[in-house]
Swiss-Prot record:
It is an enzyme of class 2 (transferase). Residues 447-481 form the PLD phosphodiesterase domain. It comes from Staphylococcus epidermidis (strain ATCC 12228 / FDA PCI 1200). NCBIfam families: poly_P_kin (TIGR03705), PRK05443.1-1 (NF003917), PRK05443.1-2 (NF003918), PRK05443.2-1 (NF003920), PRK05443.2-2 (NF003921). The gene is ppk. This is Polyphosphate kinase. An intermediate of this reaction is the autophosphorylated ppk in which a phosphate is covalently linked to a histidine residue through a N-P bond.
Length: 734
């Protein structure tokens, strides 16, 4: 009775304190778009890290540019559409209107992009120490210019088509992210203009060797230098290079679509020619009159224009690093190949999962057992059915091949291929058709929802009984990105989860109303409700026992409903530790609001992608893994799965992992009460959590090797190799 009275008094006291603070004030929140720009700047910071090899620093600069392209194509494009429609309602956190957001984006991003180009120019100069020089054609010797001219005539000139601009030739429809050269020509009768679009399929740079030196020349500089080949008989007066980014956030018309595949294909064609949202120009461009004309043709504003001190589109550095890494391997990361999973060892994945849950932590641990999980099922005559969701897969996916083989072997194969996975639509349309041709039953997703869940179900007949094996994960079934993204997964034969998995796939197939689940929590809506319930229970537990604690690891936090609950928990005294790699709309450490909340972002060699949710519950912890971030879109616009971790040893690994990341003083940045990020500084020994986990995984792999055991998965040694980030072009967005 005494404890109950104490609890009621504490709750009344908390409610009184809550009434004194208005948690809706905009100064307690970060704007989503500006928070994303700050994340992208943390990516750029990696190009300054003295512990990163030179070529990897260049890769981070390239990633920064690749990220920005998508940001403009989707987020900026969406804001511009709102402004055009006259929508001026502030967003619900930092209370900024669309136009205010666009203005703030321009200011912040201009500063960050200027920093990027400053760093790019510094690093390019460092390459000269290794006999690699970026040059203009006019800087080359006569002999090298002659070689360059031959290469231009052989490999570049045949691909170019000048597009005249006059009364008979209107302004051409230039492709999204295309690189173009504007040309003024004196035709004696008048000064006319033309545009030369540089084909995306030709190399972005050419290389020339002379002695020990290698010269790198940008293809746009080569074309400009030899531009007279395109306009023989005329005098070329001026040229400048420009790049256009277009709106790619177009609407897929699902309602009334007879065939979603056909609608997606129409959408992909439309995306290539959306309205312009950004114009990039070389800062040395002096052709103001032509630039003004171009601006008018593209119907863009001053906020959309960026003058850059170097080559446009620094994503070319992915290719340059790949080229140079063959010669300069010692300027790339020491190669790491994922090790055998500690939870699996040398056991058979199906036999062991009948005994206990199996945990996987990629890429420290190999993704190969997950590939084998599907491959073995396809080959096993005891397999009755395979069901799987696919959101993003590699272009030569072994999982796709196994699913096709399974169907050809007479198994019942059901695959949900999410056709609306942004910028993977074309790839997924291809796989959907191929799987259908192989005899798989293919589901295209759910109307107005993206199926982002990561789940695979294998049903086998064992001893005349059907047994279900379920894999649940935080990341995609993509064997390529599984080497670069940190993700987690569990394989289980838990009967409640197996029943849930069966009901989940029936629901996706459209032959079932929304089911009641035993263990799985499924969005839309249910995940948010469970989070609210668990936070409320943690508050009550803390008021009674004084040991409330919440830890969450995710990619982004934007959902205001959950942020408000976290504020409430903080005000009640619950300790909250958030590991958020990207967007964070919550400001921590504000007295009376979020003083008990800590936010840490880790950006490093690997892309942090796991989602873990921990509630202390007076030492009876509830721990979950999920495909979902705490973003509004994940809560209400996607089909997501949150699943409990009930194995105590796996739960402890997750807690240890989060504590390790919170202690990272090399790649960790903490957010202050103003929303600014700072590197974690303490007197502890240097700790890079990603490097630490790599070394621990290698130790385990070596232990298995000493036992002369053939492990499940691929044991790997550490050695130098080519750049890992070449495949990371879209890494830091998802």
């Amino acid at each position: 009775m005494h404890n109950k009275d104490k609890l009621m008094r504490c709750m009344y006291s908390m409610q009184t304190r809550l009434g004194e603070k208005d948690i809706n004030l905009p100064q307690y929140y970060n704007n989503r778009e500006l928070s994303w720009l700050d994340f992208n700047y943390r990516v750029l910071q990696e190009s300054y890290d003295k512990n990163n090899p030179l070529l990897e620093k260049l890769n981070f600069i390239s990633i920064f540019s690749s990220n920005l392209d998508e940001f403009f194509m989707v987020r900026v494009a969406g804001l511009k559409d709102q402004v055009k429609m006259g929508y001026d309602k502030p967003e619900n956190k930092a209370q900024m209107t669309p136009q205010e957001q666009l203005d703030a984006i321009k200011i912040k991003n201009t500063d960050y992009v200027n920093t990027q180009y400053q760093r790019y120019n510094e690093l390019i100069k460092e390459l000269a120490n290794y006999d690699i020089e970026m040059v203009k054609p006019e800087d080359l010797s006569d002999a090298l210019i002659e070689k360059l001219e031959q290469e231009f005539k052989l490999s570049v000139l045949p691909t170019l088509t000048p597009l005249g601009i006059d009364a008979y030739h209107p302004f051409p429809k230039l492709n999204n992210k295309s690189l173009n050269i504007f040309v003024d020509i004196d035709t004696e009768d008048a000064i006319n203009s033309a545009i030369v679009q540089i084909p995306s399929l030709i190399p972005r740079f050419l290389t020339l060797n002379e002695g020990t030196k290698q010269y790198v020349v940008m293809v746009e500089d080569v074309i400009t230098y030899f531009i007279n080949y395109l306009f023989t008989g005329y005098e070329v007066l001026n040229t400048f290079t420009f790049r256009i980014t277009r709106n790619a956030d177009l609407t897929i018309h699902e309602d009334g679509a007879e065939d979603l595949l056909i609608e997606i294909e129409r959408f992909l064609k439309e995306r290539k020619s959306g309205s312009a949202v950004r114009l990039e120009l070389d800062c040395r461009t002096s052709e103001k009159e032509n630039v003004e004309w171009l601006i008018n043709q593209l119907e863009i504003e001053d906020n959309d224009i960026y003058y850059l001190d170097g080559p446009l589109d620094l994503t070319f550095l992915f290719g340059l690093v790949d080229h140079l890494s063959h010669k300069l391997k010692y300027l790339t990361y020491e190669k790491y190949t994922p090790q055998p999973p500690r939870s699996l060892g040398n056991k058979n994945i199906y036999q062991l999962s009948l005994e206990r849950d199996i945990f996987f932590h990629h890429p420290y641990e190999s993704f190969e057992p997950i590939v084998d999980f599907i491959r073995q099922a396809a080959d096993d005559p005891n397999t009755i059915a395979i069901k799987q969701t696919l959101y993003r897969v590699s272009k030569d996916s072994p999982i796709i091949n196994s699913l096709k083989e399974a169907a050809e072997n007479g198994k019942q194969v059901t695959v949900l291929v999410e056709l609306k996975a942004r910028f993977d639509e074309e790839n997924n349309v291809h796989w959907a058709r191929m799987l259908e041709d192989a005899g798989c039953h293919v589901i295209y997703g759910m109307t107005h929802l993206k199926t982002h869940s990561k789940i695979a179900l294998v049903v086998k007949r064992i001893n005349n009984e059907l047994t279900s094996f379920v894999h649940l994960g935080t990341g995609n079934y993509n064997d390529k990105t599984a080497k670069l993204y940190t993700d987690m997964g569990i394989i289980t034969t838990n009967k409640d989860i197996a029943e849930d998995a069966i009901n989940f796939f029936n629901y996706l197939s459209g032959y079932s109303t929304k089911p009641e689940y035993n263990k799985l929590i499924v969005a839309p809506y249910d995940i948010r409700d469970v989070f609210i319930d668990r936070i409320d229970k943690e508050i009550r537990s803390h008021l009674q026992h004084g040991n409330g604690k919440i830890m969450m690891k995710m990619n982004s936090l934007t959902d205001k409903t959950i942020i408000e609950k976290l504020f409430e928990a903080s005000q009640a005294g619950v300790k909250i530790q958030l590991i958020i790699r990207g967007i964070c709309c919550l400001k921590p450490g504000i007295p009376g609001i979020s003083e008990n909340i800590e936010v840490v972002s880790i950006v490093g060699r690997l892309l942090e992608h796991s989602r873990i949710y921990y509630f202390h519950n007076n030492s009876e912890a509830h721990i979950y893994l999920s495909s979902a971030d705490v973003m509004t879109r994940n809560m209400i616009k996607r089909v997501e799965i949150l699943f409990p971790v009930e194995d105590k040893s796996i739960g402890q690994r997750l807690v240890n992992y989060m504590n390790l990341q919170l202690s990272d003083n090399q790649k960790g940045r903490y957010q202050d009460a103003q929303g600014l990020y700072h590197y974690v500084e303490n007197n502890s020994s240097p700790l890079n959590s990603q490097s630490y986990l790599m070394q621990e995984a290698i130790k385990y792999g070596e232990e298995l090797k000493k036992q002369s055991v053939q492990p499940s998965g691929q044991p790997v040694h550490s050695r130098r190799g080519g750049s890992w980030m070449r495949k990371l072009k879209n890494t830091f967005k998802r």
